[in-house]
């Protein structure tokens, strides 16, 4: 063990990101051959990654990369928020989303096969990161959108939104994306709300209106009014703009000669059982504060 120099240990540590004692142990077992030691550590890292794959990873970050009329959103999960805030984890997420964009990846499989700036695939980088930090890391979701005008907004790494517009500019699209992060609309316009959702709301409103004891024609008008209000509340265009509640989002974009085509929103851990945190309320408070 005394034949292994500190310089060699340092070099292996820089290459693998592993701990000093782990690097020294690998070099001893490889009789000082740094290439062999690095390869054995990669194999060991693969084994560690396989063992950790079943552990729940519900924390993490949302990363967005938009360029050349195309945007990619990635959700990358870790087991703890502590790791999600680690610079090494963040760097991996940034590398992954850029690689996905460059490869025009549309599926998780295509994202994992994409080459990063170091020449390794996202999957290889993921497994190396697992070996280094000791947590299950998963590339869970990828969403893409193409449009003439794109605006991205990320809140604390936990909510990522891309707004796609026809016309307008990036600043307007980013404002729309920020609004989506804060208010979380269901759809762009009221006519996109699924019929079964509208029917369910109408059923509830009808039952409530009948309890008022008012005449049938009045009840019908009440129901129509409640449905219209509901559609405005859940549709982006009908909502009060979060930065200026005196105007609707529809007027905001129309006045600038633009049209909202679509939006994509990802929340970290969405659909995974985890501690609930009201990030939308946090966005709202920061915008108003």
Swiss-Prot record:
Gene Ontology CC annotation, any one: cytoplasm
Family: Belongs to the EF-Ts family.
Residues making up the signal peptide according to the UniProt record: none
Molecular-function GO term, any one: translation elongation factor activity
Coiled coil: none
InterPro entries to which the protein is assigned, alphabetical: EF-Ts_dimer_sf (IPR036402), Transl_elong_EFTs/EF1B (IPR001816), Transl_elong_EFTs/EF1B_dimer (IPR014039), Transl_elong_Ts_CS (IPR018101), UBA-like_sf (IPR009060)
Protein name stated in the entry: Elongation factor Ts
PANTHER family assigned to the protein according to its UniProt record, in alphabetical order: ELONGATION FACTOR TS, ELONGATION FACTOR TS, MITOCHONDRIAL
Location relative to the cell: Cytoplasm
Gene that encodes the chain: tsf
